[in-house]
Amino acid sequence: MSKVAKYRRQVSEDPDIDSLLSTLSPEEMEELEKELDVVDPDGSIPVGLRQRNQTDKQPSGSFNREAMLNFCEKESKKIIQREMSVDESKQVGRKTDAKNGEDKGSNASRKALGPRQDSDVGKEPKKGVLKKSFSRDREEADSRGSEKPKEEKVIRGIDKGRVRAAVDRKEAGKDGREERAAATTKKEEEKTGSVRNAGLSRDKDKKREEVKEPSKKEEVKLTAENRSTVGRQEDGKQKESREDRDKKPEVKGIGCGSRDSRKEDEKVKKEETQPDKGVREEGKTREKQPPSGPSKPSDGQARAEEEAAPSIFDEPLEKVKNNDPEMTEVNVNNSDCITNEILVRFTEALEFNTVVKVFALANTRADDHVAFAIAIMLKANKTITSLNLDSNHITGKGILAIFRALLQNNTLTELRFHNQRHICGGKTEMEIAKLLKENTTLLKLGYHFELAGPRMTVTNLLSRNMDKQRQKRLQEQKQAQEASGEKKDRLEVPKVGALPKGSPKPSPQPSPKSAPKNSPKKAGVPAAPPPPPPPLAPPLIMENLKNSLSPATQRKMGDKVLPAQEKNSRDQLLAAIRSSNLKQLKKVEVPKLLQ
């Protein structure tokens, strides 16, 4: 019995299900049968193929074969153009290197043969030989002049290829959406496309070989021509030297003419090398110009932000400089347009400010220059109590400069410099711990020490500073209470030393004799000491402090003991018995109930 048969029996037994099935259309019945159809697993069929394919979907758009082929052709053309441009640039570089090497070789050969010709300057050469040398020089100049336009044409071709590649990229960007919609191809058409691409790649290889062959031929020709010209020059020079040796020096003017001809040849060569350098420089500038285009708007934005920043921070800067009483806090946290120059100006303005107590510049890209300016400001400023330097670019040098300035500052109580771009390191942490030993006012330090040693020492130093601040507060309270008690005593002293009611009132005009009599009495008799002040409240404060520092259990025990001081009659009797002797006690008869 299969599962389907069992399910059908259950369905037939249930009348409600039968009625539901009767209402279904034939299409719905087919779907239901497909879902209920359970096939026994076959071991020979892979697991992924045992179920029916539930991922079959209809194509979202129609396939355009022509668009696909056009796209493949454009892409192959772009690749060919890129490779051609790269090959041409390499060939131009090789040609220029070969020319430079030939020029160096010719210059060296001329230098070697120069002293021989100079030694034979006084001798008279033939006119035909001179004409031949001039004609050869002209031919070399003409050949080099013809090579220049060739190189310029090659460079122009490279630039044209780059322009075409840029235009093709723009066209490809416009047509990209249409081509992406048509990119869903079938397997057969993919095969045809791959075959065509293979054919195009073969065409590319052929073109490369064709381009390389003429380039190699040109290089071989150039080397052969250079060798032939060098050989001709050497032969002509040898002939001239032989003829000069045979003849005697008759005229000296001819030697001067040969020198002038050499100078002219050198000038011509220099002029030929200069345009080559100019062509190279133009190529470099063209390569550098394209990236400079998109950088212009970014430079303009940066300049606009720098110009806008001073306008935003001008008012607070003026308030800080003018010591405005309302300006008690300078907060420039997370400002994008602020620069290090503006931060330095703020610190310079705060140097002589006596109102601002909080200076916060977190996440403002402040560097060591700002840190050094803050250190100078802390040495002079005696009002700032909080400084926030979180999330900046300050290094260990700037932080140590700030801590050295704290040795001369006794007002800063909070300093935060966590999450800097550069890690402080163990050395700076040790230096911070050493410098904090001499500071007694810093109470809060916003930094997580990586080393355990400096971390423990700094926590102990901060707790020490907290205790010192608490002791100072207590002393100030005592002094204030003592001052208030002295004022009360001064007010009560005249009442004690007042005259009795029956004594006559002194006259408004004092007698002249009374002054000299009173002065010796005051000098001889010591003044009466002031009465002792009343008991002060500090003991109560100390008791409260003791209670606050003692644990709760001891306080409860103490509270319970206090009411026990009032003794009952029984306690009094027991105390009397303990203090009495046996002689004082009287014998008492035992009561009858206890007998």
From Swiss-Prot:
Residues 165-288 are annotated as: 8 X approximate tandem repeats. Residues 503-513, 527-538 have a biased composition (Pro residues). Gene3D superfamilies: Ribonuclease Inhibitor. Disulfide bonds: none annotated. GO terms for molecular function: actin binding; tropomyosin binding. Residues 1-322, 467-568 are annotated as: Disordered. Sequence repeats lie at residues 165-180, 181-196, 197-212, 213-227, 228-243, 244-257, 258-273, 274-288. One of its GO terms (cellular component) is sarcomere. The keyword Cytoplasm applies. Required for proper contractility of visceral smooth muscle cells. Mediates nucleation of actin filaments. This is Leiomodin-1. The gene is Lmod1.
